[in-house]
Design a protein with these regions (language model features):
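Extreme N-terminal starter segment of soluble prokaryotic enzymes
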Residues: 1-3
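Adenosine-nucleotide cofactor-binding segment
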Residues: 161-191
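Hydrophobic/small residue at the entry helix of a nucleotide-binding pocket
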Residues: 152
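Glycine-rich beta-strand-centered segment in the early N-terminal region that forms part
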Residues: 22-39, 49-92
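N-terminal Rossmann NAD(P)H-binding glycine-rich loop of SDR-like oxidoreductase domains
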Residues: 149, 157
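NAD(P)H dinucleotide-binding glycine-rich loop of Rossmann-like/cofactor-binding domains
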Residues: 85-147
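Short N-terminal binding/cap micro-motifs at the start of the first secondary-structure element
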Residues: 11-17, 42-44
Length: 191
């Protein structure tokens, strides 16, 4: 049986317990993933602390990378041995192995390491949503980006810069200003 970080009550980091969990064979349209890396995000803290309550006991974690170990009936988009990533869906990425719906997986390109993928999937979806759906940003526009030196902010700086957008980023220290500028932010406001 694989081990997983499980919470039985909401609270601080001390509520996380490393436990063996039962794991069945993949059902229809599911795959069994051997996790290699896990993304750490604020949503995990919110779930653990109860800001976003979970039915307990529960594992936490919304972003992971791994290798397909086995597939259930009807799975055609991935095969055993594929390197994959996933984000969102049912919490539970803080684990050695897990079942996951095959249609929510993405195959990872060779140039992207497992560590890079696990650290960028949720942030990348967030940036894409903000600059494509919330407001379709176009070349020549100016964007004010709060927390420009955070995980989402640094990715947004790069993406917006690539689109030809003038990026003004808010930061809280001179070091963060330097980091934001190094990632494509044109100007910073240090508050």
């Amino acid at each position: 049986m694989p081990n997983s970080i499980v919470i039985h009550k909401h609270g601080g980091p001390e509520v996380m317990k490393w436990e063996e969990i039962p794991l069945q064979n993949p059902g229809r349209s599911e795959v069994l993933i051997n996790q290699t890396k896990v993304g750490l995000n604020f949503i995990d803290i919110y779930q653990r602390s109860g800001v976003y309550p979970l039915d307990l006991p529960s594992s936490i974690g919304m972003e992971g990378v791994g290798v397909v170990e086995s597939i259930g009936e009807g799975v055609e988009n991935v095969k055993v041995g594929d390197r994959i990533g996933y984000v969102m869906g049912t919490p539970g990425s803080y684990t050695e192995s897990r079942l996951y719906p095959a249609d929510r997986l993405i195959k990872l390109p060779e140039f992207l390491s497992d560590s890079q993928a696990a650290g960028v999937l949720l942030k990348g979806l967030t940036v894409s949503y903000l600059i494509n759906r919330t407001f379709a940003v176009e070349k020549g526009q100016t964007v004010l980006l709060h927390a420009a030196a955070g995980g989402v902010g640094l990715l947004a700086c790069q993406w917006l810069n690539r689109l030809g957008v003038e990026v003004i980023g808010t930061v809280s220290t001179d070091e963060k200003a330097e980091r934001a500028i190094a990632h494509g932010c044109n100007h910073t406001v240090n508050y």
